[in-house]
Amino acid sequence: MAAQNNNKDVAALVEKITGLHAAIAKLPSLSPSPDVDALFTELVTACVPPSPVDVTKLGPEAQEMREGLIRLCSEAEGKLEAHYSDMLAAFDNPLDHLGIFPYYSNYINLSKLEYELLARYVRRHRPARVAFIGSGPLPFSSFVLAARHLPDTMFDNYDLCGAANDRASKLFRADTDVGARMSFHTADVADLASELAKYDVVFLAALVGMAAEDKAKVIAHLGAHMADGAALVVRSAHGARGFLYPIVDPQDIGRGGFEVLAVCHPDDDVVNSVIIAQKSKEVHADGLGSARGAGRQYARGTVPVVSPPCRFGEMVADVTQNHKRDEFANAEVAF
């Protein structure tokens, strides 16, 4: 009976999302407007609650709809961020007014979660330099991390769009602390090579590489050029939230030369899942590792997945094995 109810719930959800996709696709523009805001609010409201749906197992027609919807979400998100970035730039000190962005608190909570996961699972000194790939015109994540959690760290923000970087840089013009630690670069991650080796942590935005194969290529490229021991933070999605953002398979992260240390699926207003991984020193040419090597091949569902609340004690028990359990349990918070 439960399975039957789940199937009905999934079918109803897919039908609703399909209708919203059709309505959004008919909009003359995805720039912020009452109609755009109303439809995307309805979409997010439908996707955020816990759901039994596994979007990776939907049929071809639903998959095509989902892929198109994610592209629309990406375009709308870019226009929304550009709109608010321009609004903020009109202030003498834009960083004093970030709260006008309606989802700013979500970035605060997401960045806090990512910081705490890094602190618990990556045993190293405070990072000297961090890269954020896909920073966009509103680099809230870098700002929150720099201002609240990593006061001495330098941040290099990368985006394909030069206009997005121009907008972002204007937000920091009046700040002599965080602004001095922020730099913006217009580049495709595929064109970065030796630069990647200087970062202690690399953040990969959810919409960099929207198709699964593109995301896997980006991760493999990072694995080929990041320094051994450097951390990778990947934003993904879970359940119905996979209609909004791409879902990253931890196997692709393992095949890319990383060891997956933890996965967290929030069930609150933080929409993105977070995957913490570390570049392994024990990766062979075929992408496979040994011992704790990054190439460990995880079957779907056997990766250290932690459902909310993301309690670190439970995460340690899930992630570690044998003597590593004690090593992580006794580790000091380094970040």
Swiss-Prot record:
Which Pfam families would you find in this protein's record?
NAS (PF03059)
Q: InterPro entries given for it?
A: Nicotian_synth, SAM-dependent_MTases_sf
What the entry lists under PROSITE patterns is as follows: NAS (PS51142)
Has keyword S-adenosyl-L-methionine?
yes
Which segments does the entry list as coiled coil?
none
Q: Which domain of life is it from?
A: Eukaryota
Q: Name one GO biological process term.
A: nicotianamine biosynthetic process
Q: Name one GO molecular function term.
A: nicotianamine synthase activity
Assigned EC number: 2.5.1.43
Q: Which SUPFAM superfamilies match?
A: S-adenosyl-L-methionine-dependent methyltransferases
Record protein name field: Probable nicotianamine synthase 3
Q: What organism does this protein naturally occur in?
A: Hordeum vulgare
Source lineage: Eukaryota, Viridiplantae, Streptophyta, Embryophyta, Tracheophyta
User: Quick one: which gene encodes this?
Assistant: NAS3
